Amino acid sequence: MSGLWMKCAGTALAVAVGSSVAMAQTAPITLSVDLTDAPRKILHATEVMPVTPGPLTVVYPKWIPGEHGPTGPIENMAGFFITANGQPVKWERDKVDMFAYHLTVPQGVTKLEMKIDFLASSSLSGFSAGGSTSENLALLSWNTLLVYPADTNASDVMFTPSITLPAGWKFGTALDKEGGSGQMTTFRTVSLEKLVDSPVLTGRYFREVALAPETTPKHYLDMAADGPEEVELSKEHIAEFDRLVRETGALYKSRHYGSYHFLVTLSDEVAHFGLEHHQSSDDRVAPRTFIDDQEFTLNGLLLPHEFTHSWNGKYRRPAGLATSNYQKPMEGDLLWVYEGLTEYLGDVLAARSGIWTAEQYKQRLSTIAAEYDNRPGRTWRDIQDTATAAQILYAAGGGWDNWRLSVDYYDEGELIWLDVDTTIRKMTDGKKSLNDFVAKFHGLGGDTGPKVVPYTFDDVVAGLNSVVANDWATFLRSRLDSHAYQAPMGGLENGGYKLTYTDKPNAWSAMEDAESGSYDFRYSLGLHTGKSGRVSDVLKDGVADKGGLGPGMQLIAVNGRAFTPDVLKAAIHDAKDSGPAVELIVENTGFYKVVRLDYHGGERYPRLDRVPGVPDRLDDILKPEAK
């Protein structure tokens, strides 16, 4: 809800807020954050807000950019005290909008002092609401520790922020340092918009590496870990990130930031995800990600994806997501561009920069294609609806994901943009590509500072037509609104490849299974299971579904033998063609039954095969562009 005032407040209230905002523009709000208790999972803030006497409503940020939903972690806000000249000021929460606080500023008062604590979660899921601290590090998201005047534009409200760190800790951020001493640092005054867009990574074991030092503006890899060895990535990996910086310059022909910081948290004590910002990214991964080759490869998309968002999502942003403050609801209908195009370009950049080999890229692409070759939920819900409903889908979990669908605009969006790229290449005989669209669309205006240039569906269509004339509106809508069981595979076919299935998993699939401790039998028996035999998901209308299996059930035995993944694989192999059916003993909530799966197709794992006579456009796409 964006209307923050009760209807009876009337005009006098609006005037009071307006005068308060006017003063805030000439006298910034100061926000002092104390992180010395971060290892104990409690952060402290003191906020001093210039005000004028009368009614005032302040709000806690609700709709967080990049999270695409009303995810502001207000449930972990605590210790909210307001004083004026040392005397308490009573506040009252709005009865409808839980993020709004009403109060009356006493006569003669020109500023309010507010105390806010944030209880850093131990949860290993969620974005800024998830775990963000450990004994040796912390990631500060400013939106968790502030309020601001209601009905104001985030770009108009100015803040002077500062932080105080535990002894011996260092930090990285896109904010400019203004002053300070000891463990306290003051940053240059910025708008609320820029503040929320500029997290701070800090820790005891902190390292900063300058990337592609010959480029302007400057780029930095900032790392904080729970142990000193975890920030010692190899020279080879640093060189790959150097190339990533150069490849983005070659692709986007522009940069829209004063400097850029990859803020990488290496810890199992924090939630693992990536969250984009204009001049930085909040990248949280497992502790050994930079020193273990398998983990580095599996996480190879993360930094290219979040970096790409600086152009696609932060600079060029869907109009429905370009809201003026953090209380106005966002519209996610163009997330298939915001996230889908970013997923596509991020994967391509990972290959172009050498983070992945071309073969690793293709193996990952085969797993995406196979998932969307077997996506029954598409028959009732199109990819457009997953984008529109994004705000309720990020938290969706549990079984039957293939039937409910989730944030499919990421990976199915990637298939759509591969289709766009290969179509342009095919129509122009290789003379033009999606690179040309990106250079025009995201390079609009050349190099700029961090600002937002919104776009609509029609702008995307016009941008594609500026590269090559085509009925792009129909092209896109036919894919976005499709209810076919399988997602469109035109990008693979135009790229010179087709999806096939073989009896052995490719190296990428094997790495994913080893990392997650799960085993993927979706394309044979139609189920996904853990090492212990716990069924994590079942493919709707697949063999296991028709046999009566469901998520959460426990596989006890296979053909009379105690379950192991290898025993199940052997049973699938033995059943091929005219072999015996696979017989399972299954436990479900304390009850047991025998399930007979009459399947004879053998093991099936995805791979990409070349299509004879079609140019290998996919390999052309993966070639480095930087000179």
Sequence positions of predicted segments:
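C-terminal recognition in membrane/secretory proteostasis and scaffolding
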Residues: G346, W356-K627
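Acidic/histidine-rich catalytic neighborhood
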Residues: V285, R316-Q384
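Non-catalytic architectural context of zinc metalloproteases
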Residues: T36, V48-P50, P65, P70-G79, ...
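Juxtacatalytic substrate-recognition/specificity segment
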Residues: E47, A210-L335, L341, L345
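Early extracytoplasmic/domain-onset interaction patches
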Residues: Q25-W63
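N-terminal secretory signal peptides that target proteins for export/translocation
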Residues: M1-W5
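Extracytoplasmic
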Residues: P28, I42-H44, P53-P55, E75-M77, ...
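Bacterial N-terminal signal peptides
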Residues: A9-S20
